[in-house]
Amino acid sequence: MCYGKCARCIGHSLVGLALLCIAANILLYFPNGETKYASENHLSRFVWFFSGIVGGGLLMLLPAFVFIGLEQDDCCGCCGHENCGKRCAMLSSVLAALIGIAGSGYCVIVAALGLAEGPLCLDSLGQWNYTFASTEGQYLLDTSTWSECTEPKHIVEWNVSLFSILLALGGIEFILCLIQVINGVLGGICGFCCSHQQQYDC
């Protein structure tokens, strides 16, 4: 098995997932495509935690690019630097993977909390509050109660959909980074898939 190619595949996957996380988080700021709720601070508190933008997004790009740089055409060096041994590079990628695990874990936790608490919305009494906070997430199974939120329109569906997407994307990122931890340790201990001659030339 070529540990470098595996890392590169994981890296490219993480880039795509990170961009999707950023997009999903940005959409949370604009229910129904409107900007007034963000400017009036009538959004769920967990939207402002930037879990998709920072945790599952920008923070995930660091390990992603590290993983991509591990697999070179000549199979020598570390991220283009020939004076860095391949095994050392694979072991160092474990640290980058741990950063990814922290970022994706943050994304998953915040998304789960956002789903459990529900959106900030205008209720039938004309007050802005977390209508479903006391249900401990049970509102997710009872869609008939979603109409209790009168404004923004369809805010429950909006929040549930996007936080669920962030939860899923963050979970996939977490698994991929965990796989890279194992891949990095095995690659560092067992070496790359290069021939002995290539390893000597390095």
From Swiss-Prot:
It is a multi-pass membrane protein. It comes from the Eukaryota. Present in high molecular weight complexes in tumor cells. Interacts with SDCBP2. It is found in: Membrane. The chain crosses the membrane at residues 10-30, 50-70, 94-114, 162-182. One of its GO terms (biological process) is blastocyst formation. Pfam families: L6_membrane. One of its GO terms (cellular component) is membrane. Residues 1-9, 71-93, 183-202 are cytoplasmic. Highly expressed in lung, breast, colon and ovarian carcinomas. It is also present on some normal cells, endothelial cells in particular. This is Transmembrane 4 L6 family member 1. Changing C202G: Abolishes interaction with SDCBP2. Loss of colocalization with SDCBP2 at the apical region of the cell. Glycans are attached at N129, N159. Belongs to the L6 tetraspanin family. Residues 31-49, 115-161 are extracellular. InterPro entries: L6_membrane. Keywords: Glycoprotein, Membrane, Transmembrane, Transmembrane helix.
